[in-house]
Amino acid sequence: ERRRLLKALSLNLSDISLNERNMCDLELLATGVFSPLDRFMDRSDYESVLDRMRLQNGTLWPLPIALDVSETTARSLEVGQSVTLRDPEGFLLAVLHIDDIWPVDREKEALSVYGTTDDTHPGVHYLYHRSGDYYVGGAVEVLSPPLRFDFRQNRLSPLEVRAMYRKLGWKRVVGFQTRHPIHRP
């Protein structure tokens, strides 16, 4: 019922077209991979993550997850407004209920996240040259996660991963992150 209501509501809402990086973040929010985070961060969580690597509630969180938009888009938005999130082809993915809009502090984010402001670092380069000038935070109601056709057998939700562990009889699992993790698009 809620899904049908949101689809009808979406016809009268402004749209934000997501880039690949934003779609990845939306997918991870939608599938619970970013749990307990279930929304694009507001400024207070964003600042808290940059300053202490924790959400405002104290939960350890190493990277900011906020929706970047252009200055033109940001100026057309208001706190309290709902907008649709669409893929580059215009397919409806979600409705975002905006809680916060703020300008990006690129230098602070680069130093906090990457430990450098060196433009040759791929993450810093993306932040300085491809990321939007503003962040938008708020609750997301996902209608359809982004469609993916590559590596489908590896795109598992946390529930599916836990079911796989049970099926395999695994009691203990070790996680490992490389020193140089794969960079997001």
Regions found by a protein language model. Give the residues of each.
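Non-catalytic terminal extensions that flank enzyme cores
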Residues: 1-185
